[in-house]
Amino acid sequence: MKKVLSLLLLPMLFLSAAACAGGSGKNDNSTVTDGKVPTVSTVTTDKGDTTVQITGSAADTVQNDDAPTTPIGNIGVGVTCGDTSKFTDETIEILKKNNIQCVRVVFLYPFRDASGKTVSDSFSKARAAAIKLASAGFTVVGQTFWPGGMGADSSGQRTWLLHTGIPEAYARYDEDLTYDKMAEATRYIARSLKKYVEYWLVSNEPDIETYTGPMTDAQILRYINSCAKGIKEGNPNAKCGINLLGLVNPARSKLFVSRLYGNDSCLDWLGLDGYFGSLQAGGAETWDDYITQFHAIAKKPIIITEWSYPSPETDPLNTFPHQWEGHVRGKKAQADFVSACMKIFIKHEEVIGTLWYQLCDSDAVCWECGNPDCRLYSDWGILCEDLTGKPAMQAMAEASVAFQKARKKQ
């Protein structure tokens, strides 16, 4: 989410259209020499570890790579949930009952270490959750790992953290090997979920410092292209996009869009994030012009990848410095925000889906500052922590029906 990065207008490092279509990129020094992931089988030990047995070339395991790609379509109204343990049968029933069609699932770096021979526990759990959701009829939007995060270390000092599982050996963004390994990892993720996940969100809010830290613009753009390239090699039918917190530094965010989207782009849709009336100035109405501006540049379908409004009536640490004019923060205002925003999203035919942040409240300590009383990541839920409903969930259920009716008329 949410920090401002100074404007760095550095040259773009483009990948070719052939690379996006599944060909080899420049300086491909990956240990997977044929550009594909080896044949993989998994063995789970009595300790719960999942070991990957690599026995051959993926040339023997590719399925339906020559099948025609499906057109991008409406994914509907959905939610994000970073805690895969929440995807229980009870949760799935709640989502279905409230007309939720899509769910965003986060995938950290898939391997336990730099060898790339052992799948991480977090990846195994996320993969199982995605399969469960897809099998239940939801469209799963998979999100790949991002470079890291500017957060609090054990002493409370703000520093660059490799908290998405990327090995330190592959976090050197001035080296070609790093980008080869990022493509290799996303290729594996996409291939292993090929039957279940078609829509992929690449990285996370690359236009702000929080998730890119010391990287230059050229490195950030190369990272995105490398990851998208890997996804499309793993699943040529994949639909890739990025999410931008576009009104923090609009000039910089628009520069990213202009350089990442175009005729040779690996990206198929653009995601927009916003926290208006709480972390950012404005309100539900701010979305209208925001969508128009960025769609005009990208010329791609839009997914509202993060939108939310906190429900607590009190804010002792002033975590949410902005107010939605004419509204008193609380559960009713949260529900009103859902209804007001969804009317705007429905009006914009270029919007093919929405992902509310997030499914339920949490008491997790803020990773950015380390203060146990900070609610930056805690109070956005459309459900309470115990999965009981809020008025916002009913508002979302009603808006979801309206969204689907409007899109069927297009």
Language-model features: where?
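Short, acidic/polar
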Residues: D83-L95, M182-I189, P250-L260, V338-I344
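Aromatic-rich peripheral "rim/lid" segments of glycoside hydrolase catalytic domains that contact
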Residues: T314, T319-F320, L355-Q410
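N-terminal substrate-binding region of glycoside hydrolase catalytic domains
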Residues: A67-K181, L201
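Active-site cleft segment of glycoside hydrolase catalytic domains centered on the general acid/base Glu
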Residues: G116, S122-F123, S155-L267, S278-D289, ...
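Active-site beta-loop-alpha junctions enriched in small/polar residues
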Residues: T80-T84, L108, F145-P147, E205, ...
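Short, low-complexity, disordered segments immediately C-terminal to signal peptides
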Residues: A21-K47
